[in-house]
Amino acid sequence: VSVLELFRLDGRVVIVTGASSGLGVSFAQGFAEAGADLVLGARRVEKMADTAALVAAAGRRVHTRKTDVVDPEQCQQLVDAAMAEFGRVDVLINNAGVGTAVPATRETAEEFRAVVDVNLNGAYWMAQACGRVMKPGSCIINIASVLGLTTAGLPQAAYSASKAGVIGMTRDLAQQWSGRKGIRVNALAPGFFVTEMTDELRPGYLDSQLPRIVLGRLGDAAELAATAVWLASPAGGYVTGQTIVVDGGLTIT
């Protein structure tokens, strides 16, 4: 087998949550270009339809379902829909996420719980549902963040705690499932990428962070999608329990 062939995902079925915008769109498009069929979940159905159109344009099959990952039943229903449509789930991209920037002394219990419910609890419910049906050779990729490893000048305790939790959960699920079930579990920890979420940050914030990024620029979403394709493909077959940092060198400064 040639090295390039190891990066192909022909015939694989990939679930992407948070597929209506931002990195989720790039993940869906990237996996479609690598040969996979897609099952998309998101709360914003109209925007998710645009993502589905990109998958179809790449010549791949696609199924969409409105999904709020804070609800374990909706997570199970998304996986059930994938099984009904395609008969298998090979890859989960646990991408659904929200963020806030609220000083710790002013953050309400509702604000804190809302972030953790999506970013950590929702990722767990999706992994749990997929873990029930995945066969050996399957893969889960949890989307964490460099803010689970470091700080970046904004008051984001809830977001940072949730993403640090994702990193810990990734290691434990890998320990539980990789040997016994043959399911690899890894995380990606992105730095700053050009997405809708970064567009919503306060004016001047990203400019203030650029000096910390060794490569001197924000990431392109396609670069993160390519990393996910590698990690999910046979090329990444000897990697499990790891958090792959994709941040342009932010965390080494």
Regions found by a protein language model. Name each.
Residues 2-6, 150, 228-229, 240-253:
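Short C-terminal tail/terminal secondary-structure segment
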Residues 179-184, 239-241:
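Short, small/polar-rich loop/turn modules that mediate ligand/substrate recognition or access, typified
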Residues 103-104, 108-116, 198, 209:
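Substrate-binding pocket helix/loop in short-chain dehydrogenase/reductase
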Residues 132, 175-179, 237:
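Alpha-helical segment proximal to the catalytic Tyr-Lys
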Residues 145:
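Residue(s) in the substrate-gating loop at a strand-loop-helix junction
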